[in-house]
Amino acid sequence: MIDGDGFRPNVGIVICNRDGQVLWAKRYGQHSWQFPQGGVDDGETPEQAMYRELYEEIGLKPEDVTIMATSRNWLKYRLPKRLVRWDSSPVCIGQKQKWFLLQLDPGRESRIQFGCHGHPEFDDWRWVSFWYPVRQVVSFKREVYRRVMTEFAPLAMPVPVVQVNRKDGRRNRSR
């Protein structure tokens, strides 16, 4: 399903842990890494598509995660001309994405597996610092990643703990 402007509706998934790290997945047989993502099928809501893609690509089920946020807007990126399939109809020139921030529930990391539905999209994964993907993703997705991570940062980043040790309740200051 491609809209009138040539963009395919898609969902993007940022999975974080309690330390503010995000799941970064390596595309099958390639050297490129990205967040899980996938198309929205006809008749499907973005949330339904997210859960389907989450299971198909990462092997996680709704009970393994908690939705922390959804992007306010659909975010678009254009494909480089060399990746556009000009012989298809309609022509898809890019993706418009609704993003989801999920927190992996405690003790569920062992459930991550690839290829739960056909050919796997990914063959490796790791936890990376929150902002790492913005610098590392393929260049044509970089602006979308910057925007979504900026929107999700207040919810995903752990709040620093300030230790109070003094009897008067003020913070210790080290010089």
Curated annotation (Swiss-Prot):
NCBIfam families: PRK00714.1-1 (NF001934), PRK00714.1-4 (NF001937), PRK00714.1-5 (NF001938). The keyword NADP does not apply. It is an enzyme of class 3 (hydrolase). Its EC number is 3.6.1.-. It comes from the Bacteria. GO terms for molecular function: mRNA 5'-diphosphatase activity. The lineage of its organism: Bacteria, Pseudomonadati, Pseudomonadota, Gammaproteobacteria, Aeromonadales. One of its GO terms (cellular component) is cytoplasm. This is RNA pyrophosphohydrolase.
